[in-house]
Amino acid sequence: RPANPDLLPERLWNYELSYSQRLLKGTFYYGVNFFYINGDNMIQTIRTDGRPLNVNTGKVENWGAEADIAYHIHPMWRLTANYSWLHMEHPLIAAPEHKLYTGIDFTQKKWSFSTGIQYVTGLYTAVDPQEKKENFLLWNLRGSYRICSIADLFVKGENLLAQRYEINAGYPMPKATCMGGININF
């Protein structure tokens, strides 16, 4: 159990400045966001004697920027991309320095398909006693068919390149996975 009775409450201030706009009769969207985060007593789970333990990690001071775009190149096709950059004075577990995503969506009547590639670099999986970072590339794919007004059949594949990576040290993420099912919306 990661329980720790000596934990102090987290304190955090977050400042953001963002701008977004739609152009070309709503077919093109872009946005940018700048942020600054300052806090202390952040809680993270670390491994102590092979077991997880929640601890206060001290200060956090991050700043960065995010940008995203989307463009309907055709009524059935949409391109999307986003990028985020994060500078960390005090590294945090599961926080990447850079993340880039690009994808394409297709929708026609009852059919919907999407695919995208995500590149992550400088993701901290451990910070104590020694910093450890991961870099990886993921490819995901999803398709669905609307069978009625409240239900969709779906199939999806995640990490289709079967990348070996961890978000938290000691906990490997699954390689390629596929699943299907029914989504019911009430």
Question: Language-model segments: what does each one mean?
Answer:
Residues R11-Y15, Y36, K59-W63, P96-L100, ...:
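Residues that define the transmembrane beta-barrel architecture of outer-membrane proteins
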